[in-house]
Amino acid sequence: DMNDVVIYYSSTVVKDKSSNALVRTTTTFTPMNDGATYTNGFGFQLDYVGKEHIDLVQVSQEGNVIGKNFEPGIEKPVLILFSDIKPVLKKPVTVVIGFKKYDKVSDMDAYPPYNSFIFVNKRSHEVHLSGYKPTSVADESLRGTGSDLSQDSNGTPMYYIAEDNMPFAINISNSEFRWPSEKVSITTYYPEFKQWRDSFGADYKDWYLHPKE
């Protein structure tokens, strides 16, 4: 039904005028729905920017700074924003990340939505946006279990896609997205979703603007 976790986000990107290098990103994440009975946390990883390129990390909520550090013990920068989404529904969290002036970080390397993911009951049980790799602390033994498609017919690794090409998680550019009710299939609520899915995103790219009335 694609409603277990719904998070809205908006981002502001600041670039250096002379070099066009990325200076700072400010992103606000707002959990809007948690339709699952289990506990869902949320975080994101910067896949292409090392910690050595970052000189500022600040997480704030309601004007109060609640965090300044990446998750320890992981080589890549990972921020965990919520360990349980239910208590923080509709409570925005703002993340500011500053980049070192002379490192010339590309905005394509550090542009939202990042490698966002939820984790279900356990930190190691990650669910990422389809096509994104898990973090180094994810339980790799879960790959290929249940309906998970761990590789295509040519042996190419696949990430967070089911055997029927159903994505485990999606990112869309619509702040007015209407998610289906519990136990209502997204293919029923959004009739064009199936064609979009079956075409691997080539057709019906605005499916999310056309819910069933």
Language model: regions and residue ranges:
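Extracellular distal adhesion/interaction modules in secreted or cell-surface proteins
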Residues: 1-213
